[in-house]
Regions:
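Glycine-rich, basic loop-to-helix element that forms the pyrophosphate-binding segment
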Residues: 70-88, 109
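Acidic donor-diphosphate engagement hotspot in glycosyltransferases and nucleotidyltransferases
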Residues: 29, 55-56, 81, 105-107
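A conserved acidic beta->alpha catalytic loop
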Residues: 32, 48-57, 73
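The conserved acidic donor/metal-binding loop of glycosyltransferases
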Residues: 97-101
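N-proximal low-complexity "stem/linker" segments adjacent to membrane-targeting elements
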Residues: 1-35
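Conserved donor NDP-sugar-binding/catalytic core segment of glycosyltransferases
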Residues: 104-138
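Short beta-strand/loop segment that forms part of the nucleotide-sugar
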Residues: 41-50, 69-71
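Short aromatic/hydrophobic "clamp" motif used to bind/position activated sugar donors
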Residues: 93
């Protein structure tokens, strides 16, 4: 999530999703993101890395309010995220993979944490779970100091 450097905006949260050939996962991800945005002003930005399937047509049919960037080549994950960041208007920006379901309370929990720790907080990570509800260790990495 980005915070202090964002320009003033009426949008609370921008969600950036990079897509590559995961049409049905993408649909589920966007549905869960919309549910998580309840109570916030938000926008969802999908950057498609030239999927070559009908991901974007399907997305536009199901979610006409989602902002779409269509790349003519696979720009890679990092560059595609940067394209989404460049147009994001939210006070905070969330990177969300297209095969992720975000809990309906997750954004609220993150914002509550930020509100309590804003002076000491530069970013927020969440606990990730697999499809069976088991903790994914890659959601917590420690660096020795």
């Amino acid at each position: 999530m980005k915070g202090m450097e964002a320009e003033h905006s009426d949008i609370d949260v921008s969600i950036v999703i990079v897509n590559y050939r995961v049409k049905y996962f993408l649909e589920q991800t966007v549905r869960s993101a919309k549910e998580a945005l309840a109570g916030f002003s938000g926008e969802i930005i999908v950057v498609d890395n030239n999927s070559g399937d009908d991901s974007i047509e399907h997305l536009r049919k199901c979610f006409p309010d989602v902002i779409v960037i269509e790349n003519r080549e696979n720009a890679g994950f990092g560059r595609a995220n940067n394209q989404g960041f460049a147009i994001a208007r939210g006070k905070f920006t969330l990177i969300l993979n297209p095969d992720t379901i975000i809990g309906s309370h997750t954004l609220r929990d993150c914002m509550d944490f930020y509100d309590k720790h804003a002076d000491d907080c530069g970013g927020i990570g969440v606990c990730m779970l697999d499809g069976n509800g088991r903790f994914l260790p890659e959601s917590k990495r420690a660096f020795p100091t």
